[in-house]
């Protein structure tokens, strides 16, 4: 009977989810559609600020990065939305000059924004804090600027191997370039710092829409769906065997016991639900195979800007997306994830997940834990955020109202989960 109830609930939810999410997320979640529509009509030129405007930042405690790049190359980055050509540049941080670097735009939809997200590429002989690349995300559509930073902090607090993230100031050719979100790149250094040294790392790509751990036909199919970030000279055989075992198993508990770091995966699922990360089902995550230590697979979060509500059409008031979103009966706007579907099909695992979700809801995803973090971030970024809004006009609006919106989301998401978790327990 519990499984029947579970299935019935799922079927009832399907139409609600599809209708609701069509309001929340448009075809912009699908890169092919995004390119067809030719985003957006915004003026790519930033507003030049008078030199004295930067005096308000004299006491800023934010890390300051400086980028020097030929003006024609900077213009190319700002106007060529989907070009991936990196341009020569020089980068300075903490008083240290990194010569021979390259810079380009990064991201998918965000490439269409006037204020581009940036990827800084370093010489392998002169890495930046151990990394060969640096991600500086735009935050142009986030009224609070800090959703990504907070999302990575929540994942880490829940016991997930997640990137470090912080707010930084960027000077470009001697002038204020903007307030950016620095996100640590998952790479060899990232893995070593999290006891995953030597792991094989795959990035779930948005190119194919199939990076949802489904079983694919051949090596070329996996190449299209996933990008290998470490051990690049090796084949995709390990990933193929994992997805094959997932598709063919008749014993879900045995599969997860053999292949997956189960506690970390439960932590990942719980954090994903807490922050309402709906954009990870078939992209925006990494898979790491820890061959040297546990012999298990780990899921690592990525691209968390569309959490705590969604900036696509500014639906930050939506805090009640379903707990089981991303499964076959309750798909998200981009589809459903095969690993999550298999996990939630097993009653024992569902109970373990709900237990952990309840625990984290009361221990980590609380106003007592998160509001002070938001207050500190708000104080630190306020002067730079004000200048950024002038330099890069857009839809995001007032920072302080944006921070209040994140706080409101947290309260409403907590209230929803406190109501919904008991309902899900009864259905099992």
PLM features per residue range, with description:
Residues 1-428:
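Phosphate/dinucleotide-binding and metal-coordinating scaffold of catalytic cores
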């Amino acid at each position: 009977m519990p499984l029947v109830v579970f299935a019935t609930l799922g079927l009832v939810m399907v139409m609600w989810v599809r209708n609701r999410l069509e309001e929340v997320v448009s075809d912009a979640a699908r890169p092919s559609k995004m390119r067809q529509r030719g985003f957006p009509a915004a003026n790519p030129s930033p507003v030049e600020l008078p030199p004295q405007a930067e005096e308000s930042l004299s006491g800023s405690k934010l890390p300051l990065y400086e980028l020097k790049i030929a003006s024609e190359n900077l213009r190319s980055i700002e106007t060529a939305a989907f070009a991936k050509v990196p341009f020569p540049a020089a980068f300075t941080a903490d008083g240290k000059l990194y010569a021979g670097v390259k810079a380009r735009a990064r991201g998918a939809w965000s490439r269409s924004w006037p204020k581009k997200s940036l990827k800084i590429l370093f010489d392998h002989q002169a890495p930046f804090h151990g990394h060969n690349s640096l991600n500086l995300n735009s935050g142009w559509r986030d009224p609070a600027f800090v959703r990504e930073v907070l999302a990575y902090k929540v994942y880490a607090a829940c016991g997930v191997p997640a990137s470090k993230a912080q707010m930084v100031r960027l000077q470009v050719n001697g002038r204020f370039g903007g307030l950016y979100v620095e996100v640590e790149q998952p790479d060899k250094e990232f893995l070593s710092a999290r006891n995953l040294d030597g792991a094989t790392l795959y990035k779930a790509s948005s190119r194919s829409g199939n990076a949802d751990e489904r079983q694919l036909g051949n090596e070329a199919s996996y190449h299209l769906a996933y990008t290998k970030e470490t051990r690049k000279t090796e084949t995709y055989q390990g990933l193929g065997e994992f997805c094959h075992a997932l598709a063919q198993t008749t014993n879900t508990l045995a599969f997860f016991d053999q292949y997956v770091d189960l506690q970390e995966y439960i932590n990942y699922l719980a954090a994903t639900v807490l922050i309402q990360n709906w954009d990870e089902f078939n992209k925006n995550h990494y898979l790491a195979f820890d061959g040297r230590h546990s012999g298990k697979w780990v899921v690592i979060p990525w691209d968390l800007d569309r959490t705590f509500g969604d900036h696509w059409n500014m639906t930050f008031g939506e805090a009640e997306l379903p707990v089981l979103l991303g499964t076959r009966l309750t798909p998200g706007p981009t589809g459903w994830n095969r690993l999550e579907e298999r996990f939630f099909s097993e009653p024992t695992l569902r109970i373990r997940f709900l237990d952990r979700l309840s625990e984290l809801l009361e221990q980590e995803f609380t106003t007592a834990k998160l509001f002070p973090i938001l207050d500190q971030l708000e104080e630190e970024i306020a002067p730079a955020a004000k200048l950024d809004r002038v330099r890069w006009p857009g839809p995001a609006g007032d920072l302080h109202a944006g921070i209040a919106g994140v706080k409101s989301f947290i309260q409403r998401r907590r209230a929803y989960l406190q109501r919904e978790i008991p309902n899900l327990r009864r259905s099992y």
